[in-house]
Amino acid sequence: DATQAGFQPGETVRAIDLLYGVMLPSGAECCIALADTISGSEADFVALMNEKAAKLGMSGTNFCDTTGLHDANHYSTAKDIAVLLKYALRNDTFRKIIESPYHSTPATNIHPDGITFYSTMFKNLSDTVVTDGQIMGGKTGYTGEAGHCLASFAEIDGTEYILVTGGASGTGIPHINDALTVYNRLGAATQALNEGEIK
């Protein structure tokens, strides 16, 4: 079953809140609502997704739906997702959303107090600081077939790095722990290089 952000059928919602609902709690209803609004159907929006993937050179990618649920013909590679994330980070709105630990919507016709979403990455990350840097943002994913996945980015010693991992198994947050390990080792190597310990 797909994760939901909490919006209900017939609810009037701003597009920006749907975007936060996609990125922070992985709300499938937000993905489908945006696709329907933009293209008239999820299938037509998926065609646009595949067109964009081809333009970006994502040759190891084929999308079948907007939610990321398993389908034998729905696939990508870590490299392709990194290409997509690098491209998306050029958009200021996307960057603001993916860097947000939470987002509160205004009141709607169904939720008079609005809804607050929490980033599935940030809520499981007790500290964003890594050696010589900081994790800036990320998007988690999970299916039984793909395991725990994370597309993230961090700034280390003034340089922005993108890391995409998949297939993490086990309970808890193995994908987030993987990212912490890589970013900390990268930061330590950068420090050692700057201090002349590595030549």
Stretches found by the model and what they are:
Residues 41-199:
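Penicillin-recognizing serine hydrolase domain
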Residues 14, 33-36, 65-69:
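Short coil/turn segments at secondary-structure junctions
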Residues 1-32, 113-135:
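Conserved catalytic neighborhood of penicillin-recognizing serine enzymes
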Residues 11, 23-26, 38, 67, ...:
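Structured beta->alpha junctions
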Residues 18, 22-39, 45, 49, ...:
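Alpha-helical scaffold elements that line and support the substrate/ligand-binding pocket
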